[in-house]
Amino acid sequence: MYSLPGATMSAAPASIISSSSFVEPLLLAAASPAAAAAAANSHHQVRQRGHLVRTLAASSSSNTLLRSDFDLQEGLTTDVKRMLRQRQKKSGGGREMLVTIDNLKRLCIDHYFEEEIEGAMATGACTRLLHSDDLFDATLAFRLLREAGHDVSAKDDVLRRFIDGASGDFKLSLSNDVRGLLSLHDMSHLDVGGEAALLHRAKEFSSRHLASAVRYLDDPSLAEYVRQSLDHPYHLSLTQYKARHHLRYLQSLPSRDAAVERLAVAEFQLNKSLHQGEMREIKRWWMDLGLAEEIPVVRDQVMKWYMWSMAALQGSSFSRYRVEITKIISLVYVVDDIFDLVGTLEELSAFTEAVKMWDTVAADSLPSCMRSCYKALHTVTNEIAEIAQKEHGSNHVNRLRKAWAVLFDGFMVEARWLATDQVPTAEDYLRNGVITSGVPLTFMHIFSMLGYDDPSTEEEEEAIIDHMPSIISCPAKILRLWDDMGSAEDEAQEGFDGSYRDFYLMENPSRSPGEAEAHMRGLIAREWEVLNRECFCRRTFPSNLVQVCLNTARMVSVMYSYNKEQRLPVLEDYAAMMLVL
């Protein structure tokens, strides 16, 4: 149990950590693509692409939060701000202040203290710690500075002091510094280019010695924290998921920040209440839509779709957006299943042309299930365009319809490959797979609701989807590659549409499946490097858009990390943590 001094709601987070069994039925066969395919209809042709996890976020909760909840948060925020000012005055932004900032970030409550954090980072104390001979201080300072967009070098500013000149490896004396090794491990995932070899060595060194330390640590809380850090590296993992475990670890320490812990619990309670209300609203919409009854072979995984939105758009201010974007995600899944399981090539071509015309009359000649799907996506997309118009003064309906047209064209490419027994190159498959992942389409809708106008296009008909910046393409490619690794051997089906691994092995017959997977993991690592560079160096997009894209990339492994029983334990744990009563 969580026990926060003076906190009346401290028991809530503990109850969700162990309740994953309750969420299992709600994920609706999310544990295995094979289960979903079998449940659909075994006599239909299923393409090898598998679950195209479509990304992201939106929701408007029907749940009314009591004013007292916000008053409690406001009071706790004031307490923490007072503590930050005192700590800054006392330490001048030294280790104690940086540890506090790190805790605020890990607990997902740093957004309340942006001014205080920026002030502390600007004092120069963080830069001084960067050159410390203490591994923990130097690596923590590096990570916070890089995350804030500062130009720092892993080699020149930090790691060269901790490498043995004779062997070229990290000094063996560091192997017993568990706290420093944890921080080094966190730092090792922040490659932005040109540092891959050094940071890979840092990851190997820290991972090896942390794995060894788990066996002899006397503190069970610290041992569990180390295991969590190795299994779910901070930068690559969902911050909301990590926050619960970080809070539990903080509560095991002899020295604690009660105000910070209480605010973290209050924030969790508020978000959980919102998520539950949003989920109820989405379930009502999906049931009223009736597509699952009209098209029995389509996937019916409302909670799974919502969790993409919940992960990507975090915070109470995005509640309505989470609901709306979940609708988009669900319709991408439906369209995917229609292409996979329902339509003939001729019908799918007519479906695509109707979407391009963006006229409900154009859909009149389509089969009933396609008409219903078209009407739903037309309605939801126009509603999102109206939201953007009302809140930001820009109506992006033409860009959104263009995004749908691009997605349908991508599905048609795959349908023709299958119909003509054409075998694409791995590169061509992956390029088209970025589109059919659904990520670019979903991001277009999110960007519109967040009020983003692409400065690189002058005409409304032009869209960011035409020139696909890395902030969009990287999460999409990460998703496609993870999806293909997870589903290539899982999906029971007739027909063959292939995965990246299949096409790579065809082009490289001397390679084994294990080597193909290693190659794919290397591609994923390179996409993370490019995404990191966009997030931490270039800063060409607003921070809220960057965070959406980063959160999406982090969610991918949660959706596709199957265990030996073909279950998704992290997804189940995360759903229980954030949604179960």
From Swiss-Prot:
Substrate binds at R299, D336, D340, R480. Mg(2+) 3 binds at D483, S487, E491. InterPro entries: Isoprenoid_synthase_dom_sf, Terpene_cyclase-like_1_C, Terpene_synth_N, Terpene_synth_N_sf, Terpene_synthase-like, Terpene_synthase_metal-bd, Terpenoid_cyclase/PrenylTrfase. Mg(2+) 1 binds at D336, D340. Residues 1-34 form a transit peptide. Pfam families: Terpene_synth, Terpene_synth_C. One of its GO terms (cellular component) is chloroplast. Its main location: plastid. It catalyses: (2E,6E)-farnesyl diphosphate + H2O = (3S,6E)-nerolidol + diphosphate; (2E,6E,10E)-geranylgeranyl diphosphate + H2O = (6E,10E)-geranyllinalool + diphosphate; (2E)-geranyl diphosphate + H2O = (S)-linalool + diphosphate. Its EC number is 4.2.3.48, 4.2.3.144, 4.2.3.25. It is found in: Plastid, Chloroplast. One of its GO terms (molecular function) is sesquiterpene synthase activity. Binds 3 Mg(2+) ions per subunit. A motif (DDXXD motif) lies at residues 336-340. GO terms for biological process: defense response; diterpenoid biosynthetic process; monoterpene biosynthetic process; regulation of defense response; response to wounding; sesquiterpene biosynthetic process. Mg(2+) 2 binds at D336, D340. Induction: By a musk indanone elicitor that mimics herbivory. By caterpillar S.littoralis oral secretions, in combination with wounding. By corn leaf aphid feeding. Pathway: Secondary metabolite biosynthesis; terpenoid biosynthesis. Gene3D superfamilies: Farnesyl Diphosphate Synthase, Terpene synthase, N-terminal domain. Keywords: Chloroplast, Lyase, Magnesium, Manganese, Metal-binding, Plant defense, Plastid, Transit peptide. Its cofactor is Mg(2+). Belongs to the terpene synthase family. Involved in sesquiterpene (C15), diterpene (C20) and monoterpene (C10) biosynthesis. Has sesquiterpene synthase activity, converting farnesyl diphosphate to nerolidol, the precursor of the volatile C11-homoterpene (E)-3,8-dimethyl-1,4,7-nonatriene (DMNT). Has diterpene synthase activity, converting geranylgeranyl diphosphate to (E,E)-geranyllinalool, the precursor of the volatile C16-homoterpene (E,E)-4,8,12-trimethyltrideca 1,3,7,11-tetraene (TMTT). Has monoterpene synthase activity, converting geranyl diphosphate into linalool. Forms only the S-isomers of the three tertiary terpene alcohols. Monomer. This is Terpene synthase 2, chloroplastic. It comes from Zea mays. The lineage of its organism: Eukaryota, Viridiplantae, Streptophyta, Embryophyta, Tracheophyta.
